[in-house]
Amino acid sequence: DKPIVIYGMMKVAENATLNIMPGTTLYFHSDAGIEVNGSLNAIGTAEENIVLRGDRTDHMFDYLPYDMVSGQWQGLRFTKSSYNNVMKYVDLHGSFDGIVCDSSNVNIDKLELSSCTVHNCQGYGLKIVNSKVNISNSQITNTLNNCVGVFGGDVTLNHCTIAQFYPFDSKRGPALAYTNILDNEAIPLLRMDCINSIVTGYANDQIDGRNIGDETTLFNFRFINSILRTPQTEDEEHIFNTWFENVEDTAAIDGDRHFKLVNINKQRYDFHLSDKSSAIDSANVEFSLPLDRDGNKRDDRPDIGCFEFFKESNEE
């Protein structure tokens, strides 16, 4: 079969639905992306992920294919009129912004992102503005701006790996940012729950939470059973059974503390857990999901992050 190459913006009309089948790979030219005014159903399987990537198949250097370089295409945008979007088992990488959710009615589900990868973006991984979004079992990694940026709305992150090891610019943003203001406009943060998730990266502080300070504008957030690379704080109202990384731990800085491979020199990454990670067996069972990012069954003592650790497979 011939590859599907997209030039220019693919626009999904309001009241229309774009369905992308399991195993589909879409190649986007530098000016191409998807603007969703209606709905998107991109539902792959563990065996047949949907892949959204740039169209260049050559190399920048001998060791570096363009498929591993950020900023190759325009990513996805869900506009104000877009609701009830579902993405499962999707691998999106190499774009500018990965996924942008424009401001919308927070009482209606805008996006369910489940068992997905958003990686190596020359902008945001996920930029969520005043929207209702549920993110689970997903890897959001290596972005110039925030891996996940939440500007108001209702957002849940469960069993996610959010790691900021972006190699192409030292001015990379924190892995996770959340606030109740954008462009000097107050936007209530109804909820930002980060559960059973890893938030880490190179810098000592990978979390940026900013409250406008206006008591009339909601700023609701919780961290539950997560591992955070940020200065330790005592906040019994918002932080529950959560571990703070030691910023002096060079293994964490190098990614070796948690992940199988973080090689900035060759731009090779594998965010499956290493056998040294404190994420193993540390998730909250009450919030745990039965399967991980790869579709593997979690055990009775599930792990924090999107990947369950399996000793046998990791030793092969």
Residue ranges of each PLM-predicted region?
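Beta-strand/loop edge motif enriched in small/polar residues
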Residues: 1-269, 276-293, 307-316
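Carboxylate-dense, calcium-coordinating segments in secreted/extracellular and ER-lumen proteins
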Residues: 299-306
